[in-house]
Structures are given as structure tokens and as C-alpha cells.
Amino acid sequence: MITYKNILIAVDGSHEAEWAFNRAVGVAKRNDAKLTIVNVIDSRTYSSYEVYDAQFTEKSKHFAEELLNGYKEVATNAGVKDVETRLEFGSPKSIIPKKLAHEINADLIMSGTSGLNAVERFIVGSVSESIVRHAPCDVLVVRTEELPADFQPQVATTQLREKYQN
């Protein structure tokens, strides 16, 4: 039976990512594995926004830090013994599979599916697709065609996202 010891879970503040995070917590507990929770701020897309809002990157950083701290608390309270968080800047498509996976010696990367439609996915591609193509280890993409009606996010709440949108 395959066991995992270093699991990387990529989160972005979406409900799909939180759904995948919940699955990652379960896998980490079953394998008594270290769980590294990662958020990559795609700084390339923010440069144009900063013309309008000079504090946009700072807001994004604070949002990511609060998100990661919330996920760490949930994982720890759920019984994951070794939890680490990482905040990076750059392209998630490259940073996650080509840099972070090697740095933490990941043997499993988990991520959720994006909220992109077919046209957007064709034009820009998806982060999960890039991870699958470039990862040096196993990858589990947690699919959700539609989240269950009773799913309530604990961390990536509407209130948290709205707090950093203004």
C-alpha cells in the first residue's frame, strides 16, 4: 500500500480549494503525513491593478496570510500533527510543481479544480493541469462539478473574501 509522508495542498480562497483542503486533511491523518498548505499570489496579474490601487498586493498578502493561518488551525484541530504554511509570489503553475514540490520533498500534491469555464481554461490553462504535467510526484486533483448543497466553508468564507475586496 502506498503511503504519503509530505503532502502539499494548494489553496486559493475558493470553495473548491477548501473542499480539496478537507480531503487533504483526511489523507494526511490516514498517512500520519506532514501537510504543507500553500498559497501562491500570482504577482504577474497584479501589476496592472496596482495602477488603480497601490495597496492591492498588500491586501492580497494579508488575505493569503489569514487564509493560511485559518487552514493551519483547522488541520491542527482535526488531528494533523505536522502542519506548515507557505506563501509565495509568482506563477502558481510554475512555483507549485517546479519549486515548492522539490523544496518540501512532496510525495503528493493535492489541489481543487478551478472555477474557469471551458473557454477560459483553453486560453489561460488551469493551475491543476500544469501541476499534473510538471509535478515530480503523485498529484490528486479533487473534482467538484458542483459543491454539495450543505457545504459550508470554515476558512474561505464570503466574509473573509469581502474583507479584502474593498
Swiss-Prot record:
Recorded GO CC terms: cytoplasm
Source superkingdom: Bacteria
Locations listed in the record: Cytoplasm
Keyword list, A-Z: Cytoplasm
Entries under Pfam families matching the protein: Usp
Major place of residence: cytoplasm
Classification via CDD domains: USP-like
Gene3D superfamilies to which the protein is assigned, alphabetical: HUPs
Classification via PANTHER family: STRESS RESPONSE PROTEIN NHAX, UNIVERSAL STRESS PROTEIN UP12
Similarity annotation: Belongs to the universal stress protein A family.
Protein name: Putative universal stress protein SAOUHSC_01819
Organism: Staphylococcus aureus (strain NCTC 8325 / PS 47)
Lineage: Bacteria, Bacillati, Bacillota, Bacilli, Bacillales
